[in-house]
Amino acid sequence: MRLKVLGSAEDALRAMTEQLIEKLMKLDQLLKNQEEFMGSFAHEMKTPLTSIIGYADLMRMEALSKEEQKEACGYIYSEGKRLQNLSLKLMKLLVLKNQQFQMKKQDLEPMIQEAVTSMQYRLKEQDILVNLNLKKAICKIEPDLLKSLILNLIDNALKSMNSGGILTVEDRATQEGAKIYISDTGCGMPKDEISKITEAFYRIDKSRSRKQGGVGLGLAICKEIVRIHQGEMRFISQQGKGT
């Protein structure tokens, strides 16, 4: 009987030790993730700030022509807008991680249509053909968040496409709720990059992304919105063909 009690205590202690080790490993990973996040954030802040300070100092110290002043002001403005975009998206990401949202049943079709319509100027500017295949699909959502999800995914698709590309947006009702498909005929992604694209500040083509004003938070925001809706987001992509 004594041996049995000792055995039970030993098993309980082993289980507690394993749980403690597991929690410590999770905490260690969390700290590493936070460290990586802060490192990426510091880098993203440093680049535009360096440009702003550099051009402001040039204007302060040098006698520039009107054309040179205009060019310097243009760089300061564009980098300032990039900083603003970064701070706004970062605030949104933090809110998504810490706020509770009220869900209500709603049809996705008019909401997706509204999101696509609001992007009409950019779609025309890039000469993008839009294929919409929308049907009634009712599920529990937070309307503003879902619209933000659609806008971010379309924005991401537009950044990958050249003039004359094709954007397809579809929805489909399911037993669990709904599926939304957004596909493009853009440059696509390497297979080994797909698992990383929803990480904050991660960008596949950094030079192209910076030129387009991207800060690497759009898909991280999408990931959080999908998590809040207890859904999942999958990417299928082929280089040179689209995503």
Short names for language-model regions:
Residues 1-38, 53-60, 95, 200, ...:
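Membrane-proximal HAMP signal-relay module
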Residues 60-67:
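Short acidic helix/loop segment immediately C-terminal to the autophosphorylated histidine
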Residues 78-83:
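Short alpha-helical segment of the dimerization/phosphotransfer core of two-component systems
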Residues 97-103, 134, 138-144:
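Conserved micro-motifs of the catalytic ATP-binding
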Residues 122-131:
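Short conserved segments within the C-terminal catalytic ATPase subdomain
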Residues 157-158:
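Short helix-loop "hinge" at the ATP-lid/N-box region of the Bergerat-fold HATPase_c
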Residues 184:
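Acidic ATP/Mg2+-coordinating residue in the GHKL
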Residues 189-203:
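Short conserved segment of the HATPase_c
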